[in-house]
Amino acid sequence: MKAIRIAIDGPASSGKSTVAKIIAKNLGYTYLDTGAMYRCATYIALKNNYSENDISAILKELSEHPITFKKADDGSQLVFLGTEDVTLAIRQNDVTNNVSWVSAIAEIREELVAQQRRIAQDGAIIMDGRDIGTVVLPDAELKIFLIASVDERAERRYRENLEKGIDSDFETLKEEIAARDFKDSHREVSPLKAADDAIVFDTTGVTIQGVVQFIQEKAEKIIDMS
């Protein structure tokens, strides 16, 4: 039975990470949150007041403080920059609102994509992000592109923020998500788009379990055929 690679792409708050984690657990696969890696680079930039002109400094920080993922006692994923636990810090609004310009820097994408490919080379992995199926794993056995309405995605982000104790305004979240959609889909480097061979699935009004079932059935069919 072959260990496959699953790529899940889509815009902000389309449900990628939530379903990817569940499917990875169900299949016994490794889950890699590539978005967290770009958030780490953004956190570095904001913490040090770096701009687009400080690319080498950001890369140096990433080299000196490598990104690693660990499991908490409750099974949740922790994100570290060197020895610093940045799991919550990289989910703050200032990071969310700045990650687009950092992730648009070609040199940073090249470095993080190289790391992601090294991790995925043995298969049995599920990755979610913006360009997994188009750039990071163009030969992935299963590619999914999730979409959802701006209203639904803002509602999801609002609930997530409440659970994490982050103050947010629903209308502001809608504006921020729409703005990020535009930035992500219009950037010169690795713009947000579905791979030609990706399965596009609209999650608006669909439960998390419904999305998980849809993707997992596709994955299991490919695994059984391998």
From Swiss-Prot:
Catalytically driven reaction(s): CMP + ATP = CDP + ADP; dCMP + ATP = dCDP + ADP
Organism classification: Bacteria, Bacillati, Bacillota, Bacilli, Lactobacillales
Record keyword Kinase present: yes
Family the UniProt entry places it in: Belongs to the cytidylate kinase family. Type 1 subfamily.
Protein name (database record): Cytidylate kinase
A Pfam cross-reference name: Cytidylate_kin
PANTHER family named in the record: CYTIDYLATE KINASE, CYTIDYLATE KINASE/PANTOATE-BETA-ALANINE LIGASE
HAMAP family found in the cross-reference section: Cytidyl_kinase_type1
UniProt subcellular location: Cytoplasm
Enzyme class of the recorded protein, top EC level: transferase
Annotated source species: Streptococcus uberis (strain ATCC BAA-854 / 0140J)
Key words, A-Z: ATP-binding, Cytoplasm, Kinase, Nucleotide-binding, Transferase
EC number of this enzyme: 2.7.4.25
Recorded GO CC terms: cytosol
Gene3D superfamilies on file: P-loop containing nucleotide triphosphate hydrolases (3.40.50.300)
Gene: cmk
Record-linked CDD domains: CMPK (cd02020)
